[in-house]
Design a protein with these regions (language model features):
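A contiguous, well-structured pocket-lining segment that forms one wall/lid of small-molecule binding clefts
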Residues: 61, 218-299, 308-322, 349, ...
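N-terminal beta-alpha supersecondary unit
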Residues: 32-114, 143, 147, 271
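Conserved phosphate-binding catalytic cores of ATP/NTP-utilizing and phosphoryl-transfer enzymes
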Residues: 140-164, 344
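Glycine-rich phosphate-binding loop plus the immediately following alpha-helix
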Residues: 179-222, 248, 253-256
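Conserved phosphate-binding/catalytic loops in two-lobed NTP-binding clefts
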Residues: 140-141, 316-341
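Glycine-rich phosphate-binding/hydrolytic loop that grips phosphoryl groups
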Residues: 147-149, 329-367
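Low-acidity, Ser/Thr- and Arg-rich intrinsically disordered low-complexity segments
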Residues: 2-11, 16-18, 22
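Short beta-strand scaffold segments in enzyme catalytic cores
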Residues: 44-50, 165, 173-177
Length: 369
């Protein structure tokens, strides 16, 4: 599989320069221009970014996703995802470069994990081929590290330290203490489902389709919490871990007793409002515990679920009550994107780090360092 992917991509990106050595390390730059490639799941994205020690600026970005194709099949299909990445990457690269204009690129970064292994291999191979053909350095980037950067990058800044970060998405829910660019400690993670996965599965139980997190949020606005009873997972327990399997099971039993929940109407709206409140309270409780444990006064939130306004408002209220500075990934920066990958590559280029030509895809790559 990987040989076929590499061979296919080199036909698109360009040929290796005969007899010319590939750059192994970068000297420190005052200003650096990087390209980021993101293919950890079903989104295909490319971005061009300039950065220096004062901040960063997005020069060009192109993203494509086809959720309807996966939705029709009930979830993400790896083989379909690989084919989409192979088809879309060359076009998106051209589009991002055209938006950025003529710029000298110093480094390329591509997501190497965590994520779907076949999808990661496509982006990783594409990034290496692009970097080699242009004489750039190459960095394998941790997808979750990208999410740690996104709340700052969306404000035109590189990360400030120390901070506590909540990454909450369909595939990940964790709290991280970041004390430096390469100093990260996981404070808590989910013991089963991610919060975004819980939203999607509970939405499907309520007859809202899959993925249905956004539909559940919309339905919740028309309902009232407290009209039904669901548990608040892990609330008040020791540590900072999450768990959503108990909530999912309780919701299933509730729907079995009240089948009208799975049909349009007041019962469905009230159910969604209770689900929204349960997940909100769980996230707030765990984040508050992490801030108390570390004593850090800067808090960030990123990942696709942070686009949920109910979740975001609950976290904002918690931060305000605790007197904590909150940085949120804005707009498209909260979901998977290549800009955050380009930003991490820029940080490494500014630090003069060595290239990662031998890096392989790692579907379970931890963000802890």
């Amino acid at each position: 599989m990987s040989r076929w992917i590499v061979r296919s991509i080199f036909c698109v990106v360009g040929k290796w320069s005969s007899g010319e050595p590939c750059p192994i390390a970068l000297l420190s730059f005052v200003t650096v221009c990087t390209i980021g490639v993101e293919t950890s799941c079903d989104e295909t994205a490319v971005a061009v970014m300039e950065a220096d020690e004062k901040g960063c600026r997005l020069c060009g970005e192109a993203l494509a996703t086809r959720p309807e194709e996966h939705s029709a099949l009930g979830g993400i299909v790896p083989e379909l995802t690989v084919r989409q990445h192979l088809e879309l990457l060359p076009r998106l690269m051209v589009e991002a470069k055209q938006k950025a204009g003529a710029r000298k690129v110093q480094a390329v970064g591509a997501t190497a994990g965590p994520g779907l292994a076949p999808a990661l291999l496509v982006g990783l191979s594409f990034g290496k081929a692009l970097a080699w053909s242009q004489g750039n350095s190459f960095f394998a980037i941790n997808h979750l590290e990208g999410h740690l950067f996104s709340p700052f990058v969306s404000q035109g800044k590189l990360p400030e330290y120390p901070h506590v970060a909540l990454i909450v998405s369909g595939g990940h829910t964790l709290l991280v203490e970041a004390s430096g660019p390469q100093k990260r400690k996981i404070l808590g993670t989910t013991r089963d489902d991610a919060a975004g996965e819980a939203f999607d599965k509970l939405a499907r139980m309520a007859g809202l389709g899959y993925p249905g997190g956004a539909a559940l949020e919309k339905e919740a606005r028309m309902g009232k919490k407290g009209r039904m009873s669901l548990p608040r997972p892990m609330k008040g327990t020791e540590g900072c871990d999450f768990s959503f399997s108990g909530l999912k099971n309780a919701a299933r039993l509730l729907i079995e007793k009240n089948p009208e929940i799975a049909r349009p109407g007041e019962a469905r709206s009230n159910f969604c409002a209770e689900v929204q409140a349960a997940i909100n309270e769980s996230l707030v409780d765990r984040a508050s515990a992490a801030l108390k444990e570390t004593g850090i006064s800067t808090f960030t939130v990123s990942g696709g679920v942070s686009a949920n306004q109910g979740v975001l408002q609950a976290l904002k209220s918690m931060a305000q009550d605790r007197g904590v500075t909150l940085h949120c990934a804005a707009g498209g920066w909260n979901t998977d994107n290549a800009s955050m990958i380009a930003a991490v590559a820029a940080r490494r280029a500014l630090d003069g780090q060595s290239s990662d030509w031998d890096a392989d895809a790692d579907p379970r790559w931890s963000v802890a360092r």
